[in-house]
Each structure stands twice: as C-alpha cells, then as structure tokens.
Amino acid sequence: MFDKKQLEAELVLAGITRSNFAKDLGMNTSTLYKKMNGKTEWTLSEIHRIGEILGEDKIPRIFFAKKVS
C-alpha cells in the first residue's frame, strides 16, 4: 500500500520540492499530485526512478508499508 505521508517526509528530508520531484520523474506536477492522491497508479519504472532519487532502501517504506490502525 502506498504511503503518501512517508513519501512527503522523504522529500522534505532530501530537500526536494514537489515541483522538482515531478521534473526528476519526467512528469508534470498535476500528474504527480494524481499519483500521490491515489487517482492514478505508480508504474514500476516510476518506482524505480524514485529509488534512484531517494535511495532504494526507502521504497519498501513508501510503497509496501502495511497500514497500522
């Protein structure tokens, strides 16, 4: 399950704005917002690119975390 808050936290820690993150992923900002808000799915290549940008070790926490109530 995608964890939007974890991705946002990783971006803040890395000092990356959403606008720059979208550019680094090769998409416009509105597409990034749709993906972050669950309107569209992340592709495998986008997840791979996020790993290159933020670090491969961040991927499990962002994309495969279990929600705890």
How would you describe each model-predicted region?
Residues 52-69:
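Short C-terminal boundary/hinge segments that cap the last helix of small helical domains
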Residues 28, 39-40, 66:
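The DNA-recognition helices of helix-turn-helix-type DNA-binding domains
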Residues 11, 22, 51:
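The alpha-helix within a helix-turn-helix
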Residues 1-16:
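A short, Lys/Arg-rich alpha-helix, primarily the initiator
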